[in-house]
UniProtKB/Swiss-Prot annotation:
Bacitracin is thought to be involved in the inhibition of peptidoglycan synthesis by sequestering undecaprenyl diphosphate, thereby reducing the pool of lipid carrier available. One of its GO terms (cellular component) is plasma membrane. Its EC number is 3.6.1.27. Keywords: Antibiotic resistance, Cell inner membrane, Cell membrane, Cell shape, Cell wall biogenesis/degradation, Hydrolase, Membrane, Peptidoglycan synthesis, Transmembrane, Transmembrane helix. GO terms for molecular function: undecaprenyl-diphosphatase activity. The gene is uppP. It comes from Sphingopyxis alaskensis (strain DSM 13593 / LMG 18877 / RB2256). It is an enzyme of class 3 (hydrolase). This is Undecaprenyl-diphosphatase.
Length: 266
């Protein structure tokens, strides 16, 4: 597909950005445009390597997931509520994604869409941070069913590249009165079924055009993304707890504005 350095660089970008509200897909699209990373398998690569970051969540929160699994065997109410909220939150993305997949893939080739979404999303994050003051939900287990459904519906907006899946779900959670750290963690957990489904669907759809080299590139990019995300996922929660989401909003505005200038100049 492309040289090893490019594949590793894209894996690093994915690992750094998947759980930040800055759009990992948007960064991959812009980076691919700058690096000339194109070809029939490139779109599948950009989706599939996100699985590496998702595996990092399973490792980083392995004790939490193990506890939930054991709790389900005992029909523990907290474990049941946790699982219910994740599955309910995943449902809207599964339904909309199945219908809108081809349209989303077309948008994946538009750096201009990414730049605008980054810019607008940054402004939205700043506005929501100022608006939200009341905390009603302090854990995933305590989240009402309607809140999980609403956050899942908001996640569908992130099918537009540059919006950010984590950004959409976290901001949606904040608007529903979810505490910051809980909002971030729910976004992580919700990513597991969402991105596993997206990766499996993308690889299945592109199975006829993916070569052995493409699959090797995906494996390398996925592994690099996993290693980097393993560090980022815990650090992000600590940063949010101390500084909130404003730093990421300003970053989006700068990158989105810079990308628009670059595209206009190019």
């Amino acid at each position: 597909m492309h040289d090893l350095a490019t594949i590793i660089l894209l894996g690093i970008i994915e690992g750094l950005t998947e759980f930040l509200p800055v759009s990992s897909t948007g960064h991959l699209i812009l980076a691919s445009e700058m690096l000339g990373f194109t070809g029939e398998g490139s779109a599948a690569f950009k989706i599939a390597i996100q699985l590496g970051a998702i595996l990092a969540v399973l490792v980083a929160y392995r004790a939490r997931f193990w506890g939930v699994g054991m709790g389900l065997l005992r029909a523990d109410p907290a474990a049941v509520a946790f699982t219910r909220n994740i599955l309910i939150g995943f449902l809207p993305a599964m339904l909309v994604g199945a219908v809108a997949y081809e349209g989303v893939r077309a948008l994946l080739e538009s750096p201009a869409t990414v730049a605008v979404a980054l810019l607008v999303g940054g402004i939205a994050i700043l506005a929501i941070e100022r608006m939200v003051k009341v905390v009603k939900v302090e854990s995933v287990e305590a989240m009402p069913l309607r809140t999980a459904i609403a956050i899942g519906a908001v996640q569908c907006i992130a099918m537009i590249p540059g919006v950010s899946r984590s950004g959409a779900t976290i901001m949606g959670a904040l608007l529903m009165g979810v505490e910051r750290r809980t909002a971030a963690e729910f976004s992580f957990f919700l990513a597991v079924p969402t991105m596993m489904g997206a990766t499996a669907y993308s690889l299945w759809k592109d199975r006829a055009i993916l070569t052995f080299d493409d699959m090797n590139a995906i494996a390398i990019g996925l592994f690099v993304a996993f290693l980097v995300a393993l560090v980022v996922v815990k650090a992000f929660v600590a940063i949010v707890g101390r500084f909130g989401f404003a730093p990421f909003a300003w970053y989006r505005i700068i990158v989105g504005g810079g990308a628009l200038l670059w595209l206009a100049w190019k």
